């Protein structure tokens, strides 16, 4: 949306993501990313850690379930999202304001690690347009994937090998 402040942060999860469900059944995962800048000190010839930035993040629907299944405390991640300010009142009646990241995209950082990515397929209905549901298999069977095999001969409905566009 126009006017939103977009941020990308690279850091480590401080704890396992916490997965919850709204009364309407939408999944939401909450987690904190700690990002610590490193600077090279030429006088000492050593790398020094700067002051850590801790950002509270939330992600919704199917992506929330994927995060909860895939990421754990200490995972190095790349997060892109929008900064949102939220005000609330504590049980003691104190007014508080927090700034959080509403996550659009998240993935593991491959700078110091490797990852195997599996396309998630979830069964069941759900809200939000992402088709979120309860569980399901992590990877669909090849027979269910129309793009999982080479096209049959003559699939472009012509005798030549040219595509129809």
From Swiss-Prot:
Q: Per its UniProt record, what Gene3D superfamilies does this chain match?
A: Nucleic acid-binding proteins (2.40.50.140)
Q: Indicate, by first and last residue, each region the UniProt record lists as having compositional bias (Low complexity).
A: 148-158
Give the start-end ranges of region Disordered: 117-165
Composition bias of kind Gly residues appears in: 123-137
Q: Which CDD domains match?
A: SSB_OBF (cd04496)
Identify the GO cellular component terms for this protein. Answer: nucleoid
Q: Which UniProt keywords apply?
A: DNA-binding
- What's an example of a GO molecular-function annotation for this chain? single-stranded DNA binding
Which InterPro entries did the record assign?
NA-bd_OB-fold, Primosome_PriB/ssb, ssDNA-bd
Q: Which GO terms describe its biological process?
A: DNA replication
Q: Which domain of life is it from?
A: Bacteria
Residues of the SSB domain: 1-110
Quaternary structure and partners: Homotetramer. Interacts with RecA.
- Which protein are we looking at? Single-stranded DNA-binding protein
